[in-house]
């Protein structure tokens, strides 16, 4: 039941925010290249007192709340990601992916939107099996949440 709910929230997110896939692809391209990952680490080491950081993990359709976690981590590392993308060595690769303040505001809004589905998924996947009436309330609440955003 929770898996279906999670899949539904991912589909709703793709309708509300088609840029989610673009953002995932940007993170994928940073994570998949040794050079881009090294540049990311260099910036993270110089910008954060905790030292070197890895790029945010990608959202995975099978892992609950992974899109929320991806957005939360990316927002923490937004300056590092922005610097990595405009780095002169790799900037040509990201020519159409420049982040501005509006894009980060959009990411933050999507992160806020995902908080309710994450709470519902976490609750429904708890140790007690949810009743049908509870699941119905959760689904109705999520439909209302989606309709308010659209």
Specify the residue positions occupied by each region the protein language model found.
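A eukaryotic "domain-edge + linker/cap" signature
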Residues: 1-150
């Amino acid at each position: 039941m929770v898996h279906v709910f999670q899949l539904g929230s991912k589909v709703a997110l793709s309708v509300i925010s088609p840029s989610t896939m673009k953002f995932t692809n940007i993170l994928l391209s940073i994570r998949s290249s040794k050079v881009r990952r090294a540049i990311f680490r260099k910036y993270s080491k110089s910008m954060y007192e905790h030292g070197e950081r890895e790029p945010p993990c990608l959202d995975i359709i099978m892992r609950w709340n992974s899109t929320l976690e991806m957005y939360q981590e990316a927002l923490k590392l937004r300056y590092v990601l922005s610097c990595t993308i405009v780095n002169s060595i790799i900037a040509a690769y990201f020519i159409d992916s420049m982040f501005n303040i509006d894009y980060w505001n959009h990411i933050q809004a999507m992160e806020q939107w995902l908080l309710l589905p994450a709470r519902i998924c976490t609750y429904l996947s708890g140790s007690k099996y949810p009743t049908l009436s509870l699941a119905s309330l959760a689904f109705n609440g999520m439909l209302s949440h989606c309709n308010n955003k659209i």
